Amino acid sequence: TVSLVLLAVLGQSRQPMYGYQIAKRLEEVGEGVLAGKQSALYPVLRNLEAYGLLESEVEPSVSGPPRRYYRITKLGREALREWVAAWSATRDSVDTVLQGGVT
């Protein structure tokens, strides 16, 4: 699910984002539920990049060390579409069970 939400955030962004921006965005849209340790995002971002779903570029920062900016790739957008469909189907099935709809 972390991979899914990271791809979704980057897929919705018009500009590349660095880790802190991504973490803040998750806090905003997830109403705190998706908030977590920022450091936990970096291994997932690196894995997504290793699979070709993201690409990154390091750029200098005026306020500190260089920042690595991430953007979603075409392959990442395709994976995001597939994962959203799978998540929706899973969520619907779980909701049905939780609501006692299984007879």
PLM features: residue spans?
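Amphipathic alpha-helical dimerization/coiled-coil segments
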Residues: 75-103
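Beta-hairpin "wing" of winged helix-turn-helix
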Residues: 49-66, 71
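Short, hydrophobic-biased segments on the C-terminal half of alpha helices
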Residues: 42-46
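N-terminal helix-turn-helix DNA-binding core of bacterial DNA-binding proteins
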Residues: 1-40
